[in-house]
């Protein structure tokens, strides 16, 4: 970070990729990634980025694993999620997180996207 700032890159433009390893091969790495996100965000004060779908490589029902991991990562300080925006569960997880974390003030985005859906 110091080197980047010394070269004229503003701190707010620096994103750290904490790397996502597949849970099927490195299951203990899941919590390490989440802890790294938390540390980068809260101790270093930097923004974070993550390729979310890497977590589920080689597993069945990848969408389920991906959207739960995305929610866990957001809770631990993820700023920029590399996801497939065409998967409703992924965009839904982001919208629900923003609603519950009080980022989506007055639920505007959530209601705009889901207000016409029937209540189940």
Predicted features and spans:
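Catalytic alpha/beta core domains of metabolic enzymes, predominantly
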Residues: 1-118
């Amino acid at each position: 970070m110091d080197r980047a700032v010394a070269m004229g890159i503003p701190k707010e433009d620096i994103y750290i990729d904490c790397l996502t390893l597949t849970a099927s091969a490195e299951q203990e790495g899941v919590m390490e990634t989440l802890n790294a996100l938390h540390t980068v965000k809260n101790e270093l004060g930097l923004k974070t980025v993550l390729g979310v779908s890497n977590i589920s490589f080689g597993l069945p029902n990848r969408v389920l694993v991906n959207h739960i991991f995305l929610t866990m990562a957001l809770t631990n300080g993820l700023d920029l999620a590399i996801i497939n925006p065409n998967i409703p569960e992924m965009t839904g997880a982001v919208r629900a997180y923003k609603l519950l974390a009080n980022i989506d003030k007055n639920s505007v985005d959530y209601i705009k996207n889901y207000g016409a859906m029937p209540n189940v």
